[in-house]
Amino acid sequence: MNIPATVITAVLCFGITALLGFVAIPALRKLKFGQTILDIGPAWHKSKNGTPTMGGVMFIAGVVISFAAGIAIMWASGAIDMDGVGSQKLAKAISAVVMALMFGFVGFVDDLIKVKKKQNEGLKPMQKIIMQVLIIAAFFTSHVIAGDTSTVITFPFLGQFDFGIFYYIVMGLGILYLVNAVNLTDGIDGLCS
């Protein structure tokens, strides 16, 4: 791992996302891309009506731009070997970013439907889950095509365990959980971004 490039990439990601926030949030307010709050629940939730939505666009843009910059920095410094292991690691990293973009697209469509319909329901939960499962399946398929067929997971202090075919189920559920964790815990207005 190239520590300087990783630190630069993380700082760049934070900076880009914060800068985009200063630009995007007022623009979203001006465009009236606000969240509609349900009538059920405490009365004080109504004060959040109209809070800008689609904030995930800032995070996705920050990740993609900083990832590209990090790859460019590592390539320019000779840290990326495009033969063998280096190219396989790069392919895996790119597939992870593409997966994040695809999840971001699902969130964008969900928010867009909410804004267009002026209601708090976008995609149906089952529609989101099906799309997310297909994205995860495409992610795993890209790894298998790239030659990464390992089903071993390393647990700190415990060692390595080979999950066999259950690897895809465990990891798939883990990814699905992480993608939906904020939505499940936010509950009020879906605006944790």
Functional labels for PLM-detected ranges:
Residues M1-S193:
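"…together with the soluble PPM/PP2C metallo-phosphatase catalytic core" -> "…together
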